[in-house]
Structure formats: structure tokens, C-alpha cells
Amino acid sequence: MKQKIIQKIKQQIEAGIYPGASFAYYQDGVWSDWYLGEANPEIGEQTREDLVYDLASVSKVVGVGTVLTFLWKEGKIELDNSIRDYLPEVDYPDITLQQLLTHGTDLDPFIPNRDQLSEDQLKDAMFHLNRREKRAFLYSDVHFLLLGFLLENYFEKDLDQILQEQVLDPWGMKETQFGPVSRAVPTVRGQKAGVVHDPKARLLEKHAGSAGLFSTVHDLKIFLEHYLQDDFAEGLSQNFSDLSDKERSLAWNLEGDWLDHTGYTGTFIMWNRQKQEAAIFLSNRTYEKDERAQWILDRNQVMDLIREAD
């Protein structure tokens, strides 16, 4: 079945879906790696081990999602508490941590003139968002931006320092950090490599809970092994949403026993604690074009093959 997955990735590279990909699969206690296609077509650089990628929204689980799960498991926060208990500046006394972690609020993520706002103005705008007619699943970066600000209030530190102390240092993830970074796979042709692709995260830099982390296959292997083995992750393979329209774990998408998170730049990670399997897919699919709807279909083909693998 692994060969079917690799064949599909090769087909997608040949079809121009993305120039190259780094892929790793964990099964029977062993990681297998594949490095396919080109990392930087402009200079003919081949995909290889140790490349640094813009994780985009995979940052949500590597950072904020993991720290909040730690706090919850340690009894330091309650999921049904209001966000205002930890972040008094917000307008949302009725919105809980559980709703934010499962993207189940009624917040309207639209921010007028977003690209003209300063960092402080953008942060303030997220404290006073409009509301939709009713609660429903809506995947949005604002949920994890708010949770990042919550953590900064809770720890009285910048988010980058929190992630360093709570996750990256204890787990030995030395190749993971907020951008901009000096060395990375370029996400868009002609643009400087190492600059954060996501506009809000680019502006908020070390305060962004939604995106902005760069990492490697090596570090994500460490990360996923902790989710497969550590006590804190036990019990996450269940639905935490109180809505009927989408099952979600805390921070993670949930499909059966598989938990996953995807990123806009062409990234995803997956893990299955019951089967003790995991997968890492890193690409720069935004390099030549940005066809998001088609990318979701193509990405899902690879993810479905992983879920079906023996």
C-alpha cells in the first residue's frame, strides 16, 4: 500500500500539482522516507532530507494545540470555560475553549481592510469580530489566533517563548521555529524563501497561533511519536465537538481513528494511535500556482490512501 501512496505522489508531481514533496511514513515502529521531485525548480534543487518548510496551518497543532492539550490534561484549564476567563479584552463571554479548539463558534472571521492594519490593530480587530447567525463548524485561523493570545496572557510571555519552553525544547525539536528563517524551501516563485506565506501570521510573527512555524521532516517525526506514545495524547481520538455537522478532536481533524492537520502551503501530518502509524507530507504546492480547491481534492487522494493502508 505504501507504494500506491508514493505512486500517487509521483503522479501529482508529474501533473504539476507541486514541484516536489518530502514524505515520511511510520509503521511497525520504523520511519520510511521519500524525497521526490524538486524543492526549488528555479535553480534545479532536488528535494532532499533536512529541508525546512513553511508549515502554514500545521503550526496550529505543533504549537498552540499541543500546549493547550497539556494544560487541559494537567487540570490547569477547563474546556467549557469562557475565553474571557483568560482573555478579558474579548467581546465573547459565551465562547468556550472547546468551541475554539474545534472551530465550532459563530465568529465571523472577516476583518475589513485586513492588509492595511498594523499588528496591534489586527489583534484588536480579532477581539471584536462580528457574529454569524448561529454556531456551525467553520475552520478559521481566528480561533487559533485568539487561543495564541490567550496563552500569552496565561503564561505572561510571547508565544514563541511559550512554544520553545513547553514543546520544542523538551522534545528536542531544534529545527522548528517561527519565520522568517534564513533557509527554507520557497513557497512562491520569485519571492524570498523563508518569509511566512500566511498574511496574518507574517504580520503577527512570534505572536501568531494559527501559522508561521517552519520545520523539517526530522522534527515532525519527533512530534508525532510523542502523540503516538505519550500519556497526554491518550483519548484524543474521539469527537470533542458538540455540533452535529463536523467531528473534531482538540485542534485536530478527526476521520475514524486517524487525526490529521493540513496547511495551505501544501503540508499535512497524520497519526493513528490505535494502529501506531503516522505520516508527514511537506511540499510547496503554492510555488507555481494557487489552486486551492483542486489542491484539496489532490491532497485528499493521498490522505485517503494513507488511511486505507494496511
Q: What spans do the regions from the language model cover?
A:
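Short, positively charged
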Residues: 1-7, 39-42, 122, 247-254, ...
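Hydrophobic side chains within well-formed alpha-helices
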Residues: 5, 79, 96-97, 159, ...
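Active-site SXXK
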Residues: 6-10, 23, 29, 51-79, ...
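A short, well-structured edge-of-sheet supersecondary motif
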Residues: 9-46, 102-105, 114-115, 252, ...
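Active-site-proximal loop and beta-strand segments within enzyme catalytic domains
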Residues: 18, 33, 38-141
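Short, surface-exposed loop or secondary-structure junction motifs
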Residues: 33, 93-262
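Glycine-rich phosphate/pyrophosphate-binding beta-alpha loops
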Residues: 206-212, 259-271, 280-289
